[in-house]
Amino acid sequence: MSIIRSERYSAIFLLCSAALAIIFANVLDPDTWHAVHSAVSEYHIFGLITPHDIVADFLLAVFFFAVAIELKHELVKGELSSFSKAIIPGVCAAGGILVPISIYLSVASVLPNGWPVPTATDVAFSLGILAIFGSSLPSKVRIFLLALAVLDDLAGIVIIATAFSVSISYWWIIVACITVGLFGFCSYRLARCKTSKTFLIIPAMLLCALAAWVSVYQSGIHATIAGVMLGIMLNRKQGAAIEHALEPYINGIILPAFAFLAAMVRVPHLPLDEISPALWGILLGLLFGKLLGISVFGIIALKFFRKKSISFFNLLVVSALGGIGFTVSLLMNELAFLGTPVHEQGVIAVLIGSLLSAILAIILMRCYKGRKSKSLPGTKGRVSH
């Protein structure tokens, strides 16, 4: 379990899942691929839900449940608990959203649905890359990246809830609010009841959570929002333990499974003039939009508020890591383009943009390590391994 909890191995699992998916999709002949794709996306288990929806709607709701727990902790007692702590990551997060959107719309204005795709940061992947290659960086870089990613996730939640909601059923929304409220009440009671009574409250919480998910799923709002609502309503005392318990399943099963399904596309053989502008918009938005948005807005905020919370070089590292959209960007791409010819090109753009951002971040971290080695006494001329 300790390996699966590791940020390093989480990033490796995600990368391997995406790579295997692309290989799998492209070695199959077209007929077999079509049959597999139809089985995953069109076959309804018991006539209720497809395997794709189980992963993208149900399992990802569990991931967003954990994200909401982390977000609540950071807002109440963590790195976002006060204005002075939150202002620099907040400005950086705003820049990391606004600039990629601007780049995307300037390049792909004919396909405006895709503007949310380059706004996301994959917290698991970016922290994993930092853990593998950034061991020589100060610990505050991880804290800053985590705060930035949490705010990015918050923005992503708002985007999913507003931009990708269709045919809203207010009746189901009312039912969802009631069940989420009951979940919160049960959580409150669980924190204060005797151990002997927990066997009654825990099943009630699970039933309320399932009912809330079904209600949101039926409401027209993306079902992952159910996980967010439940995570926010969970009693803070229980949050850390539940998040810790879910961590190996999220890192080892849920995120790799979604990465595999989302990246399972056939690479089209297209001439340059047939490449969708959405591909360029997403790619440039992730690679350059995130880098410029986070770093430029961050520099302005540091100067304006006279803060020294992070150095310019470390801010560049965080900016590059912010361009690793991966799983969350793949989700946004599905919501924006699934069922259209642009979808596969969007997946390729997310994967290439995230990979190039990761490579840029690794180069910057290696430069920092080399510079640090030269500055230490007695290390002149040594090769840093």
Swiss-Prot record:
It catalyses: Na(+)(in) + 2 H(+)(out) = Na(+)(out) + 2 H(+)(in). GO terms for biological process: regulation of pH. The chain crosses the membrane at residues 9-29, 45-65, 87-107, 114-134, 155-175, 198-218, 220-235, 245-265, 282-302, 312-332, 345-365. Disulfide bonds: none annotated. The keyword Ribonucleoprotein does not apply. Its main location: membrane. It comes from the Bacteria. GO terms for molecular function: sodium:proton antiporter activity. Pfam families: Na_H_antiport_1. It is found in: Cell membrane. InterPro entries: Na/H_antiporter_dom_sf, NhaA. Keywords: Antiport, Cell membrane, Ion transport, Membrane, Sodium, Sodium transport, Transmembrane, Transmembrane helix, Transport. GO terms for cellular component: plasma membrane. Coiled coil: none annotated. Na(+)/H(+) antiporter that extrudes sodium in exchange for external protons. Belongs to the NhaA Na(+)/H(+) (TC 2.A.33) antiporter family. This is Na(+)/H(+) antiporter NhaA. It comes from Tropheryma whipplei (strain Twist) (Whipple's bacillus).
